[in-house]
Amino acid sequence: MNRPVIGLTCNELDKENLPKQFINEAYINSVIRAGGCPIILPITNDFDTIQAQAKMLDGLIVTGGIDVNPMIYNENPESLQGDSSLDRDYYEMRLLKYVCQKQIPILGICRGIQMLNVYFKGSLYQDLSYCKRSVLKHAQQEKRENPSHKIHIEKDSFLYKSLGDEAMVNSFHHQAIKDLAPNFKVSAKSSDGIIEAIEHESFPIYAVQFHPEAMSHKY
């Protein structure tokens, strides 16, 4: 049986002068359970390699991780901006350029929704405390597979077809979409107004702020 090849972007770790790249197993296992063939995509600044990576893919998941550097969306870092990696940011933006040219499906998860929004010229709250309104606890201390708050889903969205008008999700983020990128629409929000899912109006590009891969074995 031919399985669609699904690319998974990586995290970085530099410990004891031994740089590493890694990905949580939940992403790999979720793709396999869904019938795909997961491929881990290492971060590189080599354009030919990035283009070759894009050519082999039938789909792309832009995974979670550390914060997107605010320089990417033309802002200075504020006091609660977390760790970031320009190497990863620039790599993912170059990869997205090639993948979008192929018009293959893209799914962004957590940091992934933020990167997609920034790539398409949106902006982020560098910390949820800057929203200037009361917000839910979005950095849960529960196990990753357990839900912590409800989202409300738009009826004309991709999520509504599988989840209905509301769902319980997990939550592990301190940043969120501020200005939505052009040509995207909001698919879901939490009760405090934080954007929890988006989709492109013309292309197969979808993204969620929560971590479905961490819950997929349980629900």
Tell me what each language-model feature is:
Residues M1-L107, N117-Y119, Y125, S129-S162, ...:
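N-terminal beta1-alpha1 cap of cysteine-dependent amidohydrolase-like domains
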Residues C110:
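Conserved G/P- and acidic residue-centered "switch" motifs that form tight phosphate/ATP-binding loops
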Residues I113-M115:
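Hydrophobic, aromatic-enriched interface-forming segments
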Residues V186:
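Condensing-enzyme catalytic core mediating Claisen C-C bond formation in acyl metabolism
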